[in-house]
């Protein structure tokens, strides 16, 4: 299988819409967006519903892989501990939602994690769709419900024995799915070429610098600075950053704003400008992981907002800007020592 996932797509993860499953536990909607670097309007989306125990298992698997990468640039995110009492409180549910989202977003700039077989398996069962072509109403499941079962099903909801209470969260149901075109489409979004190499490397001990450099563009970041070419690019970025602070995103600038009856620029442009401006500063300061996340978040907001923008000229300008910063993010992977 080719490395299409790493080379052709940027990723954006969200965890949202917690709801109560009919069996009594809380589950969360997990959305993975794969944005084509060649065409920012080409977006593939995978949606799955997961519970706390699924996130906890993924956290353990990815933490193990991360430890064996010997990365010194960032700390692997912590994850909320399991608890029996209070797990249905709003604050606990929100803490778990945020912890799960932080975990998924942490994997984005690390190829060994974002193309891992564990992450691909986590999204197994989700259908690959194109949000721009499919009505979202068809993808939204019914709202949270706690149904009242008919009398003949009452026995299914009997309370667990005392010795089993508290263990329900820690159990991960196994539900193998047969191969299908939908799963083949999912496989194409996750590159697992180096699965066998990674497994053998973990078994024989720490990875060498040369091995890390094959799939980790930040492996030498702590010991070496940016290349001369990249230093020159960052000088230009500083000028671009100052311009972003002063100019709107519209291709026609102030004249276009006046031509549109003085209406203020849409809110999504301001949000994206703030994120991408900070990303430019982070890149200049050498905080490449933070810069990459900032580019992705900013482009995500642009692509979400531009679809409803009433101005054709502004839509065209925003699409060009999104493409520019997708390329900027790609350079963080390909141009660093």
UniProtKB/Swiss-Prot annotation:
Domain PX, first and last residues per copy: 1-130
Acidic residues compositional bias, start-end: 253-263
Residue numbers spanned by region Disordered: 133-156, 244-270
Keyword Repeat attached: no
Membrane topology: Peripheral membrane protein
Residue positions, PTM Phosphoserine: 201, 227
InterPro entries named in the record: Intracell_Sig-Traffick_Protein (IPR051866), MIT_dom (IPR007330), MIT_dom_sf (IPR036181), PX_dom (IPR001683), PX_dom_sf (IPR036871)
Assembly behavior: Homodimer. Interacts with SNX1, SNX2 and SNX4.
Family as reported in the entry's similarity comment: Belongs to the sorting nexin family.
Protein name: Sorting nexin-15
């Amino acid at each position: 299988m080719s490395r299409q996932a790493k080379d052709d797509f940027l990723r954006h993860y969200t965890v949202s819409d917690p709801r109560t499953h009919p069996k009594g536990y809380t589950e969360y909607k997990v959305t993975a967006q794969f944005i084509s670097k060649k065409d920012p309007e080409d977006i593939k989306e995978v949606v799955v519903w997961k519970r706390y125990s699924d996130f906890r298992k993924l956290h353990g698997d990815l933490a193990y892989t991360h430890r064996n990468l010997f990365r010194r640039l960032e700390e692997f995110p912590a994850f909320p501990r399991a608890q029996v009492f209070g797990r249905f409180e709003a604050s606990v549910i929100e803490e778990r939602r945020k912890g799960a989202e932080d975990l998924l977003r942490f994997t984005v700039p690390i190829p060994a994690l974002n193309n891992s077989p564990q992450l691909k398996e986590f999204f197994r069962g989700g259908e690959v769709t194109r949000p721009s072509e499919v009505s979202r109403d068809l993808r939204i499941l019914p709202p949270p419900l706690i149904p009242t079962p008919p009398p003949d099903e009452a026995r299914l909801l009997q309370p667990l024995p005392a010795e089993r209470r508290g263990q329900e969260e820690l159990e991960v149901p196994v539900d193998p799915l047969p191969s299908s075109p939908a799963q083949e489409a999912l496989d194409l979004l996750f590159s697992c070429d180096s699965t066998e190499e990674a497994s053998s490397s973990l078994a024989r001990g720490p990875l060498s610098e040369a091995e890390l450099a094959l799939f980790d563009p930040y492996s030498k970041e702590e010991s070496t600075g940016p290349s001369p070419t990249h230093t020159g690019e960052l000088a230009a970025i500083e000028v671009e950053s100052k311009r972003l602070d002063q100019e709107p995103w519209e291709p026609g600038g102030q004249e276009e704003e006046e031509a549109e009856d003085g209406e203020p620029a849409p809110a999504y442009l301001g949000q994206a400008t703030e994120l991408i401006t900070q990303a430019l500063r982070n890149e200049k300061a050498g905080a490449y992981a933070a810069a990459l996340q900032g580019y992705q978040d900013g482009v995500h907001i642009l692509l979400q907002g531009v679809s409803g923008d009433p101005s054709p000229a502004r839509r065209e300008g925003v699409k060009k800007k999104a493409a520019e910063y997708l390329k900027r993010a790609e350079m963080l992977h390909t141009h660093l020592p």
